[in-house]
């Protein structure tokens, strides 16, 4: 029996992007507030990307002064898998390398023995260190995640001394943290 391991392994990917915004203003000021959520499913099972973002911008004029403020915050999560060489116990391959090297005569969906232990396609025929990892087993055991939070903000004030001369002061921050995990 020949199995379509490659065709069965991949899934349809998709992306959804939802945005909401509100803005307003008058002759002396304006504002903009937005929120968004992006969700993407990868073509490899268990993979994807999500991002939530909030943003606020405002400007206010008062006499000779103009104030500006901008703030943005985002949270992003990337769920991925090992696609090529690199992790311990992976025999130097990743899910994509293993997928295209998997024998068509073996059903790749069978990656666990009845007792829950890892199924080895070459059990007893080659050393464990030279074994080929099953891509489905790798998806269950090498779950890589990156979680990133980012904050940006800026503030400025501008003083119009004359119609051709002005002074301004600007300050800002851009800060992020990323946590990586491998389960």
Regions of interest found by a model, annotated:
Residues 11-29, 36-37, 135-182:
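Outer-membrane beta-barrel transmembrane strands
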Residues 1, 43-44, 53-150, 168-183:
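Surface-exposed loop/interface segments of Gram-negative outer-membrane beta-barrel transport/assembly proteins
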Residues 3-13:
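Periplasmic N-terminal accessory/gating domains of Gram-negative outer-membrane beta-barrel systems
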Residues 9-10, 17-39, 43, 53-61, ...:
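Predominantly transmembrane beta-strands of Gram-negative outer membrane beta-barrel pores used
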């Amino acid at each position: 029996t020949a199995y379509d391991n490659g065709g069965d392994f991949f899934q349809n990917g998709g992306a959804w992007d939802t945005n909401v915004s509100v803005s307003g203003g008058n002759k002396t000021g304006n504002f903009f507030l937005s929120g968004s959520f992006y969700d993407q499913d990868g073509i490899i099972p268990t993979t994807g990307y999500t991002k939530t973002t909030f943003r606020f911008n405002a400007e206010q004029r008062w006499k000779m002064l103009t104030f500006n403020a901008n703030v943005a915050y985002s949270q992003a999560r990337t769920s991925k898998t090992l696609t090529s060489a690199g992790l311990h116990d992976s025999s130097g391959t990743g899910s994509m390398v293993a997928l295209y090297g998997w024998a068509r005569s073996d059903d790749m969906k069978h990656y666990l023995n009845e007792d829950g232990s890892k199924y080895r396609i070459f059990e007893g025929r080659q050393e464990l260190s030279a074994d080929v990892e099953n891509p489905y087993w790798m998806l269950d055991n090498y779950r890589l995640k990156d979680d990133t939070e980012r904050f940006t903000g800026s503030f400025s004030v501008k003083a119009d001394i004359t119609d051709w001369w002005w002074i301004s002061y600007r300050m800002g921050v851009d800060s992020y943290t990323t946590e990586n995990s491998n389960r």
